[in-house]
């Protein structure tokens, strides 16, 4: 999702608000066009709206805003869809294409509104403007009909709101800053935990070289050679050197998943501070029994209803209390916070050092 490098936490406006301000249900009942088709149609709608606004309308206005901090600065970047004068107010326009019938959109989606509020705050802070107007422009991708929502906001209100967003973001940034420092220190003194078997050192060296160079490495070796630890160890070392950010270990069988978990456990016994999550298939981890598979919607599943209202707290709870997050831990915390265990595990993976995929 984001990382801290060279004393900076860099994040886009969209990622910021979609993370901090997300809410609502999981709902897989509404499936239509492919993501690419929707993106293409949305881009065309954006350009059409922007061109229709006249010569004084500035489209795709870039912003970069930095919030200094003690251990790291937060650098936020993005592009406002449009800026124009409206009834004497500088107005930030946020355009959203939708396949919903816009007649039934009675208020703006908070995440969309939050994007506009970020840009409004950036503008008011830079230009010393007392009051700003934000406009949410919803355009139907089927009919091209348009619906507007407008609101005037004071600079003081925008600042108070934005400060709250940054306070929440820093909670997560501080977690990363502290954990990554502790993890990297633990990697510095890490040694290979066994005496090398024939060919094992060569394997580990070649894995490290492949990771360092960003190339693929294909290995064929018999069972019992020690392939798992010989691949996990150099991958961990690459994280300590800043070459890699995260390890993904893909497994097809339970025994290989267990081998990966055991390899990380061995390194933890040697002093490694390293967080891992095991992702279990949705149909295995779903709390509801269904002959047709998981029904991920608020009408059928209480864990889907309001999932996005609760999942951030659930994630923060588990990542700050657990280093080894397996299926049992995922289910335990999912029950505690009343969230979908599968989607919960995916969100956890953003904050882990290693991800073991079932």
Give the positions of each predicted feature.
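Mg2+/Mn2+-dependent nuclease catalytic core
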Residues: 65-159
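Walker A/P-loop
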Residues: 212-234, 246
């Amino acid at each position: 999702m984001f990382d801290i490098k060279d004393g900076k936490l860099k994040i886009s406006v969209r990622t910021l608000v979609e993370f901090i301000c997300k809410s609502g249900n999981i709902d897989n009942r509404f499936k239509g066009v492919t993501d690419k088709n929707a993106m293409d149609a949305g881009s065309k709608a954006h350009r059409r709206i922007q061109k229709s606004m006249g010569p004084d309308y500035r489209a795709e206005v870039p912003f970069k805003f930095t919030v200094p901090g003690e251990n790291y600065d937060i650098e936020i970047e993005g592009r406002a869809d449009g800026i124009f004068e409206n009834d004497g107010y500088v107005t930030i326009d946020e355009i959203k294409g939708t396949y919903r019938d816009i007649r039934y959109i009675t208020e703006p989606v908070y995440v969309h509104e939050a994007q506009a509020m970020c840009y409004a705050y950036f503008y008011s802070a830079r230009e010393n403007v007392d009051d700003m107007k934000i406009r949410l422009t919803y355009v139907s991708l089927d009919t091209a009909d348009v619906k507007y929502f407008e609101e005037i906001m004071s600079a003081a209100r925008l600042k108070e709101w934005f400060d709250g967003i940054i306070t929440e973001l820093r909670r997560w940034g501080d977690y990363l800053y502290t954990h990554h420092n502790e993890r990297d220190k633990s990697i510095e003194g890490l040694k290979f935990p066994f005496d090398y078997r024939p060919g094992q050192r060569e394997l580990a060296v070649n894995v490290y070289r492949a990771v360092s160079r960003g190339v693929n490495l294909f290995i064929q070796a018999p069972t019992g050679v020690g392939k798992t630890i010989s691949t996990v160890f150099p991958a961990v070392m690459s994280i300590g050197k800043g070459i890699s950010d995260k390890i993904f270990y893909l497994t097809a069988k339970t025994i290989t998943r267990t081998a990966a978990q055991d390899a990380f456990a061995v390194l933890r016994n040697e002093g490694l501070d390293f967080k891992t999550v095991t992702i279990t298939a949705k149909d295995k981890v779903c709390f509801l029994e269904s002959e047709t598979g998981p029904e991920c919607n608020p009408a059928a599943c209480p864990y889907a209803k309001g999932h996005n209202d609760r999942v951030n707290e659930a994630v923060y709870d588990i990542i700050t209390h657990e280093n080894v997050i397996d299926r049992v831990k995922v289910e335990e915390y999912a029950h505690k916070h009343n969230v979908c265990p599968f989607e919960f595990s995916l969100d956890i993976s953003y904050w882990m050092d290693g991800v073991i995929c079932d």
